[in-house]
């Protein structure tokens, strides 16, 4: 085979693999003025399907799913004033929704039962 052709094929394969392994967070969807954020809670940490960058003040619906085999919880506060916005327990595999008003102060959330660090989101516009 032609060495140039082999090199081009190898580069094409590497480029294709690099595209297929990149993952992009979804943008938060807004319906009827409410922005939805999905949070999956695992043992000691949260994962989100949507990016938390560039959020705007407004009404948010957090859909939290307990992905562990034990009782956990969800707590959300105003990031500046530490005002409690919502707090509740989640049984294993349970999903609950928290609808809150987020201001330009930002917000922070954590599990108050299974110690996790505060996830502080202060870039809300």
Regions found by a protein language model. Give the residues of each.
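Extracellular/periplasmic metallocenter environments
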Residues: 26-47, 90-125
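Short, solvent-exposed loop/turn elements at domain surfaces
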Residues: 44-48, 71-74
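Bacterial N-terminal signal peptides
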Residues: 10-18
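Bacterial N-terminal signal peptides that target proteins for export
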Residues: 2-9
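Surface-exposed, proline-enriched loop/turn segments that connect beta strands in immunoglobulin-like
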Residues: 49-51, 85
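Surface-exposed loop/edge segments in extracytoplasmic proteins
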Residues: 73, 81-88
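Sec/Tat signal peptide C-region and signal peptidase I cleavage site
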Residues: 21-25
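Beta-strand cores of secreted/periplasmic/IMS beta-sandwich domains, seen most often
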Residues: 51-70, 96-110
